């Protein structure tokens, strides 16, 4: 598959001081610097006869790279994959739901393995539970002047334009809710490259005391938050799973008491539930009167319960202004309901009140993908689309960019012959609506006024529902910040 520099398949020679190993897949030589007197880098040393005396093994921390066996101990001390000390804002499972093993079935078969009778019974339960719900949401498709130039830039391809339209609408909805202003902290969950915060910052121009916290659990390339060097706004990126994020422990929120605006574009499945719990339970509840029950009655390990109790006590160490809302608002574009998890779902109480439980939730979340899998591309269309994206270097390709089409992640959820495409789409939308309704009730119980609306055209994205929430009886953030 790969040969050295002497291979007839290797055109030319490696650059001076660079590895002589020819990478067949990339049609070029390895570009790693070699040690003095060596032909190959450490990773490809096995290809050189003179290196045979030293054995290379897979790194036990990350098998994607190798290391000399006789230098393993030294390597483990500096390997980038070694476990790093946990930051103060990391508290294990602080935003996790209750693990009730009695409710989780031992084995759940794929939808395709259900009998026609079992499937009909599930759909009947779904329709009964959805009675009275308004399946047609209001259109709140908006835009914002901050993105005007980008939206009209011919250099942006179709993919980039679709993302810009969504970001413009989310930004317009944030402004419409009067959440766009100075003296606050925007927490972007599932931030990715950080482009939503980027546009919020541009829209705010020179607003004072604006802080951005970008939460993402994986390392991300081509981040845009590093481009912001303004004095009036600060960007801080946290690489952490939302499940373990304690906002109360972040210095700027602990010291300055800035109202938080939770935002997100296409926050996948259970990440939405974790973000809601992070905002309205772990964070907002710590500012409530201490004679109320601290946070939620969730069974956790002793360490976590102790941390929560400490946070509740620390919440009023500084005088908090009267009528001040720790969470000024929530604006999250929903996505990927098929990735929800019963343990973390915030609407369990709503489901139970309808006579539903973990089994029904499991199948409803699987069937929710039917709402976005009806408009499948042909192989030719998909191939052409892929080629087009590769040719256009300006396209803003991101995780949910599929040109408005969605493909289910589990072929076992398909039921050819039993239901038509339109029937499946309607059932999928009902599943999404029911899951979202549980989130709505949860926010209402926590003292918020939530709403669901369409924020973009389905031709732009089939995941086009926006969840917004404002605290009840809240005064304008401009006057309370």
Curated annotation (Swiss-Prot):
The modification N-acetylalanine is found at residue 2. Disulfide bonds: none annotated. InterPro entries: Methyltransferase_TRM13, Trm13, TRM13/UPF0224_CHHC_Znf_dom, Znf_CCCH-type_TRM13. Its EC number is 2.1.1.225. GO terms for biological process: tRNA methylation. Residues 381-408 are annotated as: Disordered. It catalyses: cytidine(4) in tRNA(Pro) + S-adenosyl-L-methionine = 2'-O-methylcytidine(4) in tRNA(Pro) + S-adenosyl-L-homocysteine + H(+); cytidine(4) in tRNA(Gly)(GCC) + S-adenosyl-L-methionine = 2'-O-methylcytidine(4) in tRNA(Gly)(GCC) + S-adenosyl-L-homocysteine + H(+); adenosine(4) in tRNA(His) + S-adenosyl-L-methionine = 2'-O-methyladenosine(4) in tRNA(His) + S-adenosyl-L-homocysteine + H(+). The keyword Zinc applies. One of its GO terms (molecular function) is zinc ion binding. Pfam families: TRM13 (PF05206), zf-TRM13_CCCH (PF11722), zf-U11-48K (PF05253). Zn(2+) binds at residues 59, 65, 75, 79. It is an enzyme of class 2 (transferase). Residues 113-140 form a coiled coil. Keywords: Acetylation, Coiled coil, Metal-binding, Methyltransferase, S-adenosyl-L-methionine, Transferase, tRNA processing, Zinc, Zinc-finger. The keyword Glycoprotein does not apply. A zinc finger (CHHC U11-48K-type) spans 56-83. Belongs to the methyltransferase TRM13 family. tRNA methylase which 2'-O-methylates cytidine(4) in tRNA(Pro) and tRNA(Gly)(GCC), and adenosine(4) in tRNA(His). This is tRNA:m(4)X modification enzyme TRM13 homolog. The lineage of its organism: Eukaryota, Metazoa, Chordata, Craniata, Vertebrata. The gene is TRMT13.
């Amino acid at each position: 598959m790969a040969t050295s520099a002497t291979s007839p398949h290797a055109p030319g020679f490696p650059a001076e001081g660079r590895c002589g190993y020819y990478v067949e897949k990339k049609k070029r030589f390895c570009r790693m610097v070699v040690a003095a007197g060596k032909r190959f880098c450490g990773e490809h040393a096995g290809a050189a006869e003179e290196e045979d005396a030293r054995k290379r093994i897979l790194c036990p921390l990350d098998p994607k790279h190798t290391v000399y066996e006789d230098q393993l101990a030294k390597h483990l001390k500096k390997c980038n994959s070694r476990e790093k000390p946990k930051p103060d804002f990391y508290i294990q499972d602080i935003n996790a739901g209750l693990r009730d093993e009695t409710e989780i079935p031992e084995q759940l078969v794929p939808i395709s393995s259900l009998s026609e009778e079992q499937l009909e019974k599930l759909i009947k339960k779904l329709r009964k539970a959805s009675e009275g719900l308004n399946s047609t949401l209001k259109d709140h498709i908006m835009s914002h002047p901050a993105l005007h130039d980008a939206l009209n830039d011919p250099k942006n391809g179709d993919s980039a334009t679709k993302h810009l339209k969504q970001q413009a609408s989310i930004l317009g909805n944030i402004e419409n809710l009067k959440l766009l202003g100075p003296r606050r902290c925007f927490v972007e969950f599932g931030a990715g490259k950080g482009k939503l915060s980027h546009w919020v910052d541009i829209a705010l121009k020179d607003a004072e005391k604006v802080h951005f916290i970008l939460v993402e659990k994986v390392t991300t390339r081509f981040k845009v938050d590093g481009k912001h060097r303004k004095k009036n706004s600060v960007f801080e990126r946290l690489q952490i799973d939302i499940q373990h994020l304690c906002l109360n422990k972040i210095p700027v929120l602990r010291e300055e008491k800035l109202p938080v605006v939770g935002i997100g574009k296409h926050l996948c499945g259970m990440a939405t539930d974790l973000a809601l719990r992070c905002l309205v339970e772990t964070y907002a509840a710590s500012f409530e009167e201490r004679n109320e029950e601290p946070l939620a009655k969730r069974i956790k390990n002793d360490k976590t319960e102790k941390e929560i109790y400490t946070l509740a006590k620390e919440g009023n160490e500084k005088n908090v202004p009267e009528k001040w809302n720790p969470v000024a608002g929530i604006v999250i574009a929903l996505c990927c309901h098929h990735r929800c998890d019963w343990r973390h779902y915030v609407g369990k109480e709503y489901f139970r009140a309808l006579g539903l439980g973990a089994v029904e939730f499991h199948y409803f979340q699987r069937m929710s993908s039917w709402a976005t899998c009806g408009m499948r591309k042909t192989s030719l269309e998909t191939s052409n689309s892929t080629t087009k994206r590769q040719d256009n270097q300006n396209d803003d390709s991101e995780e949910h960019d599929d040109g408005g089409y969605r493909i289910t992640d589990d072929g076992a959820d398909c039921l050819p012959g039993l239901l038509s495409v339109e029937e499946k789409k309607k059932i999928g939308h009902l599943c999404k609506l029911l899951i979202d309704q549980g989130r709505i009730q949860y926010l209402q119980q926590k003292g918020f006024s939530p709403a669901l609306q369409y924020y973009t055209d389905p031709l732009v994205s089939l995941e086009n529902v926006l969840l917004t929430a404002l605290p009840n009886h809240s005064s304008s953030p401009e006057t309370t910040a």
